[in-house]
Every structure is written in structure tokens, then in C-alpha cells.
């Protein structure tokens, strides 16, 4: 049973299932879908609010834990020189899509769509890892390169959400951010007091951080991003991303181990809450987002990875031009975070739906990457 559940997680079946159910529901009965998703059917809360502002706290908390672990000695982003080329590629993978989006939008002459520039900046780590494993094989050095890039990519994505996408309906109230600082202070004191359970950090520090972001009209989903780095952890990281060290019982590792499964399966709810757009929603924003992910990611990552090599920061062994181009194409799968940002970037339902369709259609990068891998005869290492 456990093997089958792990297979479902590995192939991102919960997220994909949620997306499919939402798409079918929204296209068969859009009124009932909107009622379920946005009306206050759960006391004072809507299903959409519960998923995006409560459940996604854990999703971004797990992302913060993975980034924190990767920055420890022995982790994938330590020391810095080891990660220079992937980090340069990350810059290309963020700047490239933004440039494509801004230039295409200028050519289209629709200033109202400019706010969506942040949608194509992040990569869906889980789906990218799955596709890369199918293209390269699980032991190919290109996998580690892609995951390093995706981790840093997500860190930038979190910063973009926090800084550039406040609630457009409510003015920011930065005075409430003192609660976020209080939460961080509480977490620091707990760590100094050697609290060896993650619960006090999450409840006290996370609770204060969530309240501060909510009252400041920012994104409470990011509450644990400010708290998780304070969780006690070993001095060295012994495993790579998606590898579990069952001997690591630190609060940081325990938080990730105990919540990652629930988060992976809970992504069904995220897909259900955010992917319900009608096929008639396809519009200018769809093609802006899709082109930015496919062209901007591929071109940006390829160019900066090539430039890094020219500057003396080598690519991993067995990663040449064709592998680098495939990594860029796979990184164009922007499903989860892109859907989240699309929901924050636009309040107009038509523009929001069109942008979300672009994020959903970016899953087609998987098909393109699999086909390109065959055509270019990429050697798989299993």
C-alpha cells in the first residue's frame, strides 16, 4: 500500500487529478463550481481561502525547509562556487520569462496585462523532477542541476509574491509586519532555548507571522517562510533534494518528513481550488504566460548556463548544450506557483482565467521535452 501511495506522489497524481476535476467541473457547470470555490460555505471562509491561505502555508513551509537544507554545508547549494552555474541559470530562468512577457505585452499594447509579469518566473519542482527523470533517467547529473535551479527559482518566486503582489483590493498596512518580526523573534528565542519540537515554532512563531501578513494585506500563505529557517537542524546536510535521511531527527527534518506527504496529497485541493477555468477563457494573457514559460525559460537558462561555463563555472559532467536546452524546457513547467501568482496578479475573472490557462498549458513542456529527448538521442542514466 505504501509503495502505491509513494508512486502516486512521485507522479504528482493528486495535483494532476485536482486540476482535471476542476477543469471538467468548471466547464460543465461553471456556476456550481464558482459557488463551491468562492462562496463562504465553511463558516466565514470560502474553500478557496482555506486552500490558498491556510493549506498553502504548509506548501510554502515545505519549500522553505528544502531551501534551508540545501543551503547547509553538504547541501546542494553549498558551497556557493559549486552552485554558481545553476544560480546563473536561475537568474536566466527568471529574467528570461519576464523579458519575453514584457516585450510581447508591449507589442500587443495592453498595459492592463503587465501586472502578470511574475506568473512565469517559477518552476514546479515536483513535476519538473518527474519529467526530467523520464527524459534523463534518475541518475543523470542534469537532474541535480535542474533541482538546484528549481530550488533557487522557488526562493525568488516566494520573494516576488511577497514583494510585488499585495492584495489589490486592500492597501498594504506594513505596520502589522511587526507581528511577523515578533514571530521570528519568538522562533529565535525557542531555538536559543533549545526547543526540540517543531510545534512551538509553528504554532507561536507561525501564528504570529500569519496574523501579521494577513493584517498587513500581504500573503499569509508565506507565514512559515519566515519561521522555518529557525528550526534546529544538523550542521551538515547528508542527502540531496527528494532524498530522505531517516536518521535525521532534527525539528527541521521532522517537520518536512511529517508534513510532506500530506502536502503532496493536499495538492489535489490546490488544483481543485485554482484550476477551474473554462476553455473559453483562452486569451492574450494565455499566450503571454505560455510563451514566457516556454521561450523565456528555455532561452534564459540556456544562455546563462552557457555564459557561466564561458566564465569558468563548469556545467556538471555529461551536461552539454542539448541537455542544458532540455533542462530549460522542462523548467518551463510552471503549474503550481504560476497558478497561485495568476490568482493574485489579476482580479478581473477573464484575465485571471486566461493567465491560468497559460500556466496549465505549460504542462505541455513535458511532452515537448520527452519528444526532444528522443530526437536529440539523449543518453539516459538510470
From Swiss-Prot:
GO terms for biological process: regulation of pH. The keyword Membrane applies. It is found in: Cell inner membrane. The chain crosses the membrane at residues 10-30, 45-65, 87-107, 116-136, 145-165, 170-190, 211-231, 252-272, 275-295, 326-346, 353-373. Keywords: Antiport, Cell inner membrane, Cell membrane, Ion transport, Membrane, Sodium, Sodium transport, Transmembrane, Transmembrane helix, Transport. The keyword Endoplasmic reticulum does not apply. It is a multi-pass membrane protein. GO terms for molecular function: sodium:proton antiporter activity. GO terms for cellular component: plasma membrane. It catalyses: Na(+)(in) + 2 H(+)(out) = Na(+)(out) + 2 H(+)(in). Na(+)/H(+) antiporter that extrudes sodium in exchange for external protons. Belongs to the NhaA Na(+)/H(+) (TC 2.A.33) antiporter family. This is Na(+)/H(+) antiporter NhaA 1. It comes from Pelobacter propionicus (strain DSM 2379 / NBRC 103807 / OttBd1).
Amino acid at each position: 500500500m505504501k509503495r502505491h501511495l509513494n508512486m502516486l506522489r512521485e507522479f504528482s497524481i493528486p495535483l494532476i487529478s485536482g486540476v482535471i476535476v476542476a477543469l471538467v467541473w468548471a466547464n460543465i457547470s461553471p456556476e456550481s463550481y464558482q459557488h463551491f470555490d468562492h462562496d463562504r460555505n465553511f463558516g466565514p471562509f470560502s474553500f478557496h481561502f482555506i486552500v490558498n491561505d491556510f493549506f498553502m502555508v504548509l506548501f510554502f513551509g515545505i519549500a522553505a525547509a528544502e531551501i534551508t537544507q540545501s543551503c547547509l554545508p553538504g547541501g546542494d547549494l553549498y558551497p556557493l562556487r559549486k552552485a554558481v552555474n545553476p544560480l546563473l541559470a536561475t537568474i536566466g530562468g527568471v529574467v528570461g520569462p519576464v523579458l519575453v512577457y514584457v516585450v510581447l505585452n508591449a507589442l500587443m499594447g495592453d498595459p492592463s496585462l503587465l501586472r502578470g509579469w511574475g506568473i512565469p518566473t517559477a518552476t514546479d519542482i515536483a513535476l519538473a523532477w518527474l519529467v526530467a527523470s523520464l527524459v534523463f533517467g534518475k541518475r543523470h547529473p542534469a537532474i541535480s542541476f535542474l533541482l538546484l535551479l528549481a530550488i533557487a527559482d522557488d526562493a525568488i518566486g516566494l520573494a516576488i509574491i511577497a514583494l510585488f503582489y499585495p492584495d489589490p483590493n486592500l492597501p498594504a498596512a506594513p505596520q502589522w509586519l511587526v507581528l511577523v518580526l515578533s514571530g521570528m523573534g519568538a522562533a529565535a528565542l525557542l531555538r536559543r532555548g533549545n526547543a526540540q519540537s517543531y510545534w512551538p515554532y509553528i504554532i507561536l512563531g507561525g501564528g504570529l507571522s500569519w496574523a501579521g501578513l494577513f493584517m498587513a494585506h500581504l500573503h499569509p500563505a508565506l507565514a512559515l517562510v519566515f519561521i522555518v529557517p529557525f528550526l534546529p537542524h544538523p550542521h551538515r546536510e547528508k542527502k540531496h533534494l527528494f532524498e530522505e535521511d531517516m536518521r535525521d531527527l532534527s525539528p527541521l527534518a521532522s517537520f518536512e518528513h511529517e508534513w510532506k506527504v500530506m502536502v503532496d496529497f493536499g495538492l489535489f485541493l490546490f488544483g481543485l481550488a485554482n484550476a477551474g477555468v473554462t476553455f473559453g477563457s483562452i486569451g492574450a494573457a494565455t499566450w503571454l504566460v505560455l510563451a514566457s514559460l516556454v521561450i523565456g525559460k528555455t532561452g534564459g537558462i540556456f544562455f546563462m548556463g552557457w555564459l557561466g561555463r564561458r566564465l569558468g563555472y563548469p556545467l556538471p559532467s555529461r551536461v552539454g548544450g542539448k541537455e542544458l536546452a532540455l533542462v530549460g524546457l522542462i523548467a518551463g513547467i510552471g503549474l503550481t506557483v504560476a497558478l497561485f501568482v495568476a490568482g493574485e496578479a489579476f482580479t478581473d475573472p477573464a484575465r485571471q482565467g486566461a493567465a491560468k490557462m497559460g500556466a496549465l498549458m505549460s504542462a505541455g513542456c513535458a511532452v515537448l521535452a520527452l519528444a526532444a529527448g528522443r530526437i536529440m538521442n539523449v543518453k539516459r542514466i538510470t
